[in-house]
Amino acid sequence: MSITLNEVKRREKGLKIIKDKIETDGIDSLIDLTGLAGGFDITPEDISLLETYAGPAVYEQKVQKLGIKHLGGEKILPVNRTTSGIVAMIIALVKPGTKIVHFLAKKPAHPSIPRTAKLVGADYEEYTNLDEFKIDDNTSLVFITGTTMDLEVISVEDFKRVIKQAKEKDVIVAVDDASGARIRRAVYNQPTAIDLGADISVTSTDKLMEGPRGGLMAGSTEIIDKIKLVVNQYGLEAQAPLIVGMIKGLEKYSPERIQEAFKQKDELYQKLLDKQLNPQTTPTGFMFKEEEIKAEVEKRGAKVDMDADVIATVYSMLLIDNYNIITIPAVGMPGASKTVRFDWAAKDSDKLTMDELVSAVCDTFDKTVEVCKNNDFESVLYN
């Protein structure tokens, strides 16, 4: 038997489990290790200002100051999601019939980039090898992903080589720094994308920081104003409540937690090796790719006639249901990576010990084996 993963129903099931956990045991019972938990730390005084015009008037200057400190550049543009910023950027800067070229450490790119390229009638090419990377005369935008969805980081040298090639062709460079604005800088001590020479940088205010799901874009005043026009035309701007949450997240952000997780990850990794598991390390924890989860389940005796993305999602769903541990495959947006990633920098990691996490990881593999043997996939994923 084989099934195709229904992304909408899968996410609805994951969120229902979370809702039931909150109603039964409270929100503090959840252990969100996605690195995307975010936060919305606003005060009664903030709430009194959350009106259509009063809010932007009061908070604009503050988000500009904090955003520039975090990302660099001359001007900041808050948007309702990083994806929104990418969409607006491409609509504003890319003409039909031209090309977007993209360099990243490992494919695939965030789907919003190729999808919007198609939307505006532009060609799109991805490169992971700098020796093959090329910018022809028809290129209107160069993208760089600073840190991939699985937290793989490109070097400063590669950054500079791509930017140099783009500048030689007089092509605008945009950096998708969704989590990279924290990982690259806190762990690898890299400069901001703007300081490296990029024209635009966009980051997610919920990734490895305690802000709400939203996006912050930085760049020159001229370029940001051009993109801002599109953002306002399409209703992609961050409203006052979101901007306040972003400000609080930026104020609370400190690289120390990320740096501490980076130091501890090797101890955590060794505990997993001691259990005969072989995850991949990330800068702030560890992860199992979907194929690795399938292989581990098969190693434990299950005969798996099912695609790896389904197995990984089952594993993620069982983690929530049995251990209250949230990972991306069960609850991420449609199209999100099915890598099961455990972020030890997440604030909820304080709720359990390393040994408790390792025990949950191992037991969930056994539970996934039972699902495979009993052919309970649809029940776990959707019912």
Curated annotation (Swiss-Prot):
Record-stated family: Belongs to the UPF0425 family.
Cofactor: pyridoxal 5'-phosphate
GO terms classed as biological process: transsulfuration
Pfam families, per database record: Cys_Met_Meta_PP, UPF0425_C
Keyword tRNA processing applies: no
Keyword Magnesium appears in the UniProt entry: no
Name of the protein described by the UniProt record: UPF0425 pyridoxal phosphate-dependent protein Msp_0916
Organism of provenance: Methanosphaera stadtmanae (strain ATCC 43021 / DSM 3091 / JCM 11832 / MCB-3)
GO molecular function: L-seryl-tRNA(Sec) selenium transferase activity; pyridoxal phosphate binding
Domain of life of the native organism: Archaea
Modified residues (N6-(pyridoxal phosphate)lysine): K207
Keywords: Pyridoxal phosphate
